[in-house]
Amino acid sequence: MDRSAEFRKWKAQCLSKADLSRKGSVDEDVVELVQFLNMRDQFFTTSSCAGRILLLDGGINGFEVQKQNCCWLLVTHKLCVKDDVIVALKKANGDATLKFEPFVLHVQCRQLQDAQILHSVAIDAGFRNSGITVGKRGKTMLAVRSTHGLEVPLSHKGKLMVTEEYIDFLLNVANQKMEENKKRIERFYNCLQHALERETMTNLHPKIKEKNNSSYTHKKKNPEKACAQCITKENDKELENDDDDDLGINVTIFPEDY
């Protein structure tokens, strides 16, 4: 079976499976983006989360939060208010932790070139911890992600360790991150549409394709210039201030049984 046929088989199998996430469906803020990618021949999404604010109640034998072994006291993909957190905290018996988790998207790509286009767009949109993973069987995965998360312990053994004023402060920070996260998703979607339109035009005109052969490398070195029509000066400034994010491409090889 050739690579294209094998990719189509993987795509059909993945998209026919039931959604096994807790919610059981794609988050509202990324439905259009996910549908757009899945309609393209060269991509399909394997998992996604639009970003969320969580209050988790973990065990009392350590501070490391394991989402699989803890109680979800509160989860929202929208802005969160203090009263909801205070009410949820009353149910905590162990170590409650407030978290903000930014947008994450995993996309299987038909070939490395397709993944490079998505990676370049993700970097330009502010998801600077994105990376590409290549398996020995030919599976090429693109992970869109960033590092602007938040994780703060609030209680220990069921006892609240912070003031309500501090909780209010943390929620302001988390909500700001949620709003910035949404802007980045919108930038990513807009830039993606422009990039794929350019790719289509390039494929229709071979001379343009030859001229743009080094575009991915150029974008990687100069992400602030690569999608000028998608990113305003104000947005560009926000990305410059995001010092925790790292630029670059991450390519690893999975074992044979991947």
UniProtKB/Swiss-Prot annotation:
- Kindly list the positions at which Phosphoserine occurs in this protein: 25
The gene for this chain is: TYW3
Q: Could you say which protein family the record assigns here?
A: Belongs to the TYW3 family.
GO terms (molecular function) for this protein are: methyltransferase activity
Q: Which EC class does it fall in?
A: transferase
Q: Which reaction does it catalyse?
A: 4-demethyl-7-[(3S)-3-amino-3-carboxypropyl]wyosine(37) in tRNA(Phe) + S-adenosyl-L-methionine = 7-[(3S)-3-amino-3-carboxypropyl]wyosine(37) in tRNA(Phe) + S-adenosyl-L-homocysteine + H(+)
In terms of SUPFAM superfamilies, this protein maps to: SSo0622-like
Role according to the record = Probable S-adenosyl-L-methionine-dependent methyltransferase that acts as a component of the wybutosine biosynthesis pathway. Wybutosine is a hyper modified guanosine with a tricyclic base found at the 3'-position adjacent to the anticodon of eukaryotic phenylalanine tRNA.
Going by the entry's taxonomy, the superkingdom of the source organism is recorded as: Eukaryota
Q: Which UniProt keywords apply?
A: Methyltransferase, Phosphoprotein, S-adenosyl-L-methionine, Transferase, tRNA processing
Q: What is its EC number?
A: 2.1.1.282
Coiled-coil annotation reads none
Protein's GO biological process: methylation; tRNA processing
Write out the pathway annotation from the protein's UniProt entry.
Answer: tRNA modification; wybutosine-tRNA(Phe) biosynthesis
Q: What Pfam families does its record include?
A: TYW3
Query: What is the name attached to this protein's record?
Result: tRNA wybutosine-synthesizing protein 3 homolog
